[in-house]
């Protein structure tokens, strides 16, 4: 998958450099997102009145996804993680690895994204 362009439009919601490659915006919007080591996005929520949520498919490297109140889950190439709608979460690269995932927006009604606070170094550095 293409790496895409620097993710400048959303840089304020990331710690570190990421790149974004839109693959399709029809039916199920899908993007390839690439993270340099230690890069992660802020906590955020994919809101939906009905349906919605997000699916991550790791295609390269190693990264993390964490739902609020749960332990972080390691993602490796070929693994899929489903994020339910209306759940606060974050995702990003491992400390020592690049990370690339496909991000699929699950269709729904009344969908919107809410960006929240950064994942601090204190929280991130506790990951193995």
Question: Predicted regions span which residues?
Answer:
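Conserved hydrophobic/aromatic beta-strand scaffold that supports enzyme active sites
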Residues: 20-22, 30-34, 55, 72, ...
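Ligand-binding loop in jelly-roll beta-barrel domains
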Residues: 64, 72, 77, 85-113
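Short, charged/polar surface micro-motifs in flexible loops or helix N-caps
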Residues: 26-28, 35-40, 60-64, 109
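Conserved short histidine dyad/triad with adjacent acidic residue
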Residues: 17-19, 31-50
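Glyoxalase I/VOC metalloenzyme domain signal
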Residues: 3-4, 36-38, 84
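A short, N-terminal "cap"/entry segment at the start of jelly-roll beta-barrel domains
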Residues: 1-29, 42, 112-128
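A short beta-strand-loop-beta hairpin characteristic of the jelly-roll/cupin
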Residues: 40, 50-77, 87
């Amino acid at each position: 998958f293409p790496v895409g362009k620097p993710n400048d439009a959303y840089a304020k919601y990331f710690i570190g450099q990421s790149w974004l490659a839109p693959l399709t915006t029809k039916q199920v919007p899908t993007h390839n997102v690439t993270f340099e080591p230690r890069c992660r996005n802020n906590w955020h929520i994919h809101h939906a009145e009905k349906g919605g949520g997000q699916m991550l498919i790791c295609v390269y490297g190693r990264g993390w996804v964490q739902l609020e109140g749960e332990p972080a889950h390691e993602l490796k190439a070929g693994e899929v993680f489903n994020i339910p709608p209306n759940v606060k979460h974050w995702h990003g690269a491992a400390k020592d690895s690049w990370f690339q995932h496909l991000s699929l927006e699950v269709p729904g009604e009344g969908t919107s994204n809410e960006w929240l606070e950064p994942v601090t170094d204190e929280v991130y550095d506790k990951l193995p």
